[in-house]
Swiss-Prot record:
The lineage of its organism: Eukaryota, Fungi, Dikarya, Basidiomycota, Agaricomycotina. The keyword Ribosomal protein applies. InterPro entries: Ribosomal_eS32. GO terms for cellular component: ribonucleoprotein complex; ribosome. This is Small ribosomal subunit protein eS32. Residues 1-25 are annotated as: Disordered. Belongs to the eukaryotic ribosomal protein eS32 family. It comes from Agaricus bisporus. Initially thought to be part of the large ribosomal subunit. Crystal structures show eS32/eL41 to be a small ribosomal subunit forming a bridge at the interface of the 2 subunits. The keyword Ribosomal protein applies. Pfam families: Ribosomal_L41.
Amino acid sequence: MREKWKKKRSRRLRRKRRKMRARSK
């Protein structure tokens, strides 16, 4: 069950993380 919400949240977090990384750079 933990992997289920982790996989769905991972997709959203991955997009937000990409923006944060570009801002940090």
